[in-house]
């Protein structure tokens, strides 16, 4: 996604933004449900008041009005907005939701030829200079 000094924010240059966006493509919402204390439709992600930004030590106990428990907020989830270096998990429930997308509206992935090896074109790389 870029490097520091190339116009890319260095806290987000480890490729996790792509992971986050693929999560959306596979039917995941942000862990705060895209609303104040909203619903992400996944039972094993704790309720969150809003997005987290930056990077924290676990547990990050910024308790909010949504019912976060003593385990702290799930800031390290790919579907939050923390720095790339702090994102590292999808929950089992999120994985189930993504598999449901692959078995449903994204089922074409299973028969796609996009993962097959590319066949050589039979073009010669020999160049003659005169």
Regions found by a protein language model. Give the residues of each.
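Extracellular (secreted or membrane-anchored) zinc-dependent metallopeptidases
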Residues: 1-21, 25-129
């Amino acid at each position: 996604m870029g490097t520091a000094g190339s116009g890319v924010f260095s806290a987000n240059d480890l490729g996790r933004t792509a992971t986050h966006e693929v999560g959306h493509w596979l039917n995941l919402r942000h862990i705060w449900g895209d609303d104040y204390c909203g619903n992400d439709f996944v039972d094993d992600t704790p309720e969150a008041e809003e997005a987290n930004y930056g990077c924290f030590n676990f547990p990050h106990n910024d308790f909010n009005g949504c019912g976060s428990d003593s385990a702290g907020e799930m800031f390290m989830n790919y579907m939050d907005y923390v720095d790339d270096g702090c994102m590292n998990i999808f929950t089992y429930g999120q994985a189930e939701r993504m598999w449901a997308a692959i078995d449903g509206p994204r089922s074409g992935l299973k028969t796609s030829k996009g993962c097959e090896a590319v066949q050589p074109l039979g073009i010669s790389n020999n160049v003659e200079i005169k």
